[in-house]
Curated annotation (Swiss-Prot):
Source organism per UniProt: Tityus serrulatus
Protein's job: Alpha toxins bind voltage-independently at site-3 of sodium channels (Nav) and inhibit the inactivation of the activated channels, thereby blocking neuronal transmission. This toxin acts on Nav1.2/SCN2A, Nav1.3/SCN3A, Nav1.5/SCN5A, Nav1.6/SCN8A and Nav1.7/SCN9A voltage-gated sodium channels, with the highest affinity for Nav1.3/SCN3A, followed by Nav1.6/SCN8A and Nav1.7/SCN9A which are affected almost equally. Interestingly, shows a significant shift of the voltage dependence of activation for Nav1.3/SCN3A that is characteristic of beta-toxins.
Top-rank taxon, per record: Eukaryota
GO molecular function: sodium channel inhibitor activity; toxin activity
Domains (record comment): Has the structural arrangement of an alpha-helix connected to antiparallel beta-sheets by disulfide bonds (CS-alpha/beta).
Distribution of this protein across tissues and organs: Expressed by the venom gland.
Pfam families: Toxin_3 (PF00537)
Modified residues (Cysteine amide): C82
Designated name of the protein: Alpha-mammal toxin Ts2
Signal sequence region: 1-20
Length: 84
């Protein structure tokens, strides 16, 4: 039983490492990429195409992406330069 739990734990860690980071997509000015007036499914396609993410959705009013490679920048409150 302990071996099984260890195996499951290792699989979860591998999944976390392989999946990548997550966050809001940014526009060219460093602001969150708006999905306010976009059609359904837009953010999933945008995240996959432009950020090489595994998926995305509209976390109203901005696109939120999952599985973003580490070298791709996503919006971060600490380094926010939007409107500055």
């Amino acid at each position: 039983m302990k071996g099984f739990l260890l195996f499951i734990s290792i699989l979860m860690m591998i999944g976390t490492i392989v999946v990548g980071k997550e966050g809001y997509a940014m526009d060219h000015e460093g602001c969150k990429f708006s999905c306010f007036i976009r059609p359904a499914g837009f953010c999933d396609g945008y995240c996959k195409t432009h950020l090489k993410a595994s998926s995305g959705y509209c976390a109203w009013p901005a696109c939120y992406c999952y599985g973003v490679p580490d070298h791709i920048k996503v919006w971060d409150y600490a380094t926010n330069k939007c409107g500055k």
